[in-house]
From Swiss-Prot:
<keyword id="KW-0676">Redox-active center</keyword>
<comment type="similarity">
    <text>Belongs to the HSP33 family.</text>
</comment>
<dbReference type="GO" id="GO:0051082">
    <property type="term" value="F:unfolded protein binding"/>
</dbReference>
<dbReference type="Pfam" id="PF01430">
    <property type="entry name" value="HSP33"/>
</dbReference>
<dbReference type="GO" id="GO:0044183">
    <property type="term" value="F:protein folding chaperone"/>
</dbReference>
<keyword id="KW-1015">Disulfide bond</keyword>
<dbReference type="GO" id="GO:0005737">
    <property type="term" value="C:cytoplasm"/>
</dbReference>
<feature type="disulfide bond" description="Redox-active">
    <location>
        <begin position="230"/>
        <end position="232"/>
    </location>
</feature>
<keyword id="KW-0963">Cytoplasm</keyword>
<feature type="disulfide bond" description="Redox-active">
    <location>
        <begin position="263"/>
        <end position="266"/>
    </location>
</feature>
<comment type="function">
    <text>Redox regulated molecular chaperone. Protects both thermally unfolding and oxidatively damaged proteins from irreversible aggregation. Plays an important role in the bacterial defense system toward oxidative stress.</text>
</comment>
<dbReference type="InterPro" id="IPR016154">
    <property type="entry name" value="Heat_shock_Hsp33_C"/>
</dbReference>
<dbReference type="InterPro" id="IPR023212">
    <property type="entry name" value="Hsp33_helix_hairpin_bin_dom_sf"/>
</dbReference>
<keyword id="KW-0862">Zinc</keyword>
<protein>
    <recommendedName>
        <fullName>33 kDa chaperonin</fullName>
    </recommendedName>
</protein>
<dbReference type="InterPro" id="IPR000397">
    <property type="entry name" value="Heat_shock_Hsp33"/>
</dbReference>
<dbReference type="GO" id="GO:0042026">
    <property type="term" value="P:protein refolding"/>
</dbReference>
Amino acid sequence: MAQHDQLHRYLFENYAVRGELVTVSETWKQILENHDYPMPVKTLLGELLVATSLLTATLKFAGDITVQLQGDGPMTLAVINGNNRQQMRGVARVQGDVPADADLKTLVGNGYLVITITPEEGERYQGVVGLEGDTLAACLEDYFMRSEQLPTRLFIRTGEAQGQPAAGGMLLQVLPAQDAQTDDFNHLATLTETIKADELFTLPANDVLWRLYHEEEVTVYDPQAVEFKCTCSRERCADALRTLPDEEVAQILEEDGEVDMHCDYCGTHYVFDAMDIAGIRKNASPADPQVH
């Protein structure tokens, strides 16, 4: 079996092209765990997860990337957020019936792809592109050509391995400020396109790379672990409560006896009673109870 949920970066010695290979099956399972999405939505979230992991690995600084799809289709939102430590989380919102064979256009309808890059230090950048491609990979390749002017190819696979959800993918990209020959890039893309889903899901990364590129000279760097990680906390919820008008919070307490805040990403509930709210209003630290 492959070492799942790892990202491998690699470099071609004879071409100005770099690559990435990632498997994210366990992380995908955890993202889906607290939700009952229709199968096409699950699949698209898996594709988004693979893509976000690959894109996050292109960052040259500490920060995070959010990749989201928005539209007027039955899936109004799908979003994956990841940081340079390959800590990922994601969620989708569905309104209306989703056909069992729904593709990207059917799910999103008239919509667009938004990529937000947020460095820990420096200015936030946001790029928006229409969904002109038939697949998520095609839309992202279009984004790179428009915004970065870097020829980029993504190869995304989702499915099952041993009865469990499995997802992985690969990225090829011309190195910035390098003049890679189009024929060279297309040659490597043609090789990479032959990757089979079951190979990606079940073989060690080095075996996959050897099968694809055994006639090329490739340097493979140490892998980086990929994991599901939610950034929600009781303190963040308390900060959000501080921004609400006193009357609104008082009304919730009067009607429900407590304020129950739910994280869409991980399913955790943070419950605040009247004493907690009073403490928050005085800037005191709320107590610890939370419910998964």
